[in-house]
Amino acid sequence: MTSNADQLPQSADSVMQAADQFAQRQLVPHAAQWGRGYFERKALFEPAGAAGLMGLQVPLEWGGMALPFADKAKVLHKLAQIDFSAAMALVNSHNVVAQLVKASPHTLAPLYAGNLMRGLMVACTALTEPGAGSDLGHIQTTAVRQGEGWLLNGEKTWIINAAHADAVVVYAQTQTGSGVKGIAAFLALADTPGFERVAVTTHTALSSMGIGGLRLKNVYCDASHLVYAPGEAFVDIMAAINRARTYVAAMCC
């Protein structure tokens, strides 16, 4: 954890200035190239981390900016005016940091929040499936107890940052027939055996968004990598989807 306990949240003006400087320095020169499919991960996430943009809603004690949601939406609107795809990639990784700090401050956040906020790691959320879309009650990805952890099996598709991610929050069914009550969320690492990226056909202009699929074949997650237990994950993801509808609308304006 980065100790910023004595600091005050940055003003909205200073954050917007930092976002504008980042946009002019990194997005303007690269947007056209990325739009043709020539995306370089390090040119986006690490500079964004250095500008503080990977911690917009992360608490101060973790080194974040502790912005209210409305100011986060304003920052995303500014970035999206120049490169919507890149802005979506950034916010999706940022959202995982905020999620880990909230849900797992003693286990997962100390391991991953720092590198995610610096842009040294990239994260994504894997919900959508080929046969179920984003309908949590009908997802087919399963999580089965294995010793002290879980084995994940299934396929996700149309996932933002799937092509870039080092860490993925995977939503999976832990008990067949239990509907949303059995859904849990796990943090899976891309270097785990059985983790496979799957290409999806999309427009080259979206290359910085890293849209892709994931195939999980007996991917092992330690018990400590359970982000939300069964019964908790559904409530969290539905709230997250509602927030996303709001900030994506702001990005489109």
Regions found by a protein language model. Give the residues of each.
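Cytochrome P450 C-terminal beta-domain/meander region
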Residues: D135-N153
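Short glycine/proline-enriched turns and hinge-like loops at secondary-structure junctions
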Residues: L67-F69, D135-G137, N161-A165, G179-G182, ...
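A short, Trp-centered hydrophobic/proline-enriched beta-strand micro-motif
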Residues: G119-L127
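A short core secondary-structure module
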Residues: N153-R197
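Internal helix-loop-helix
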Residues: A50-G119, N161-A167
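Glycine-rich phosphate/pyrophosphate-binding beta-alpha loops
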Residues: Q81, S93, T157-A162, L206, ...
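Intrinsic disorder at enzyme termini
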Residues: M1-S11, A143
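Glycine-rich beta->alpha junctions and the first turn(s) of the following alpha-helix
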Residues: S3, V15, A199-C253
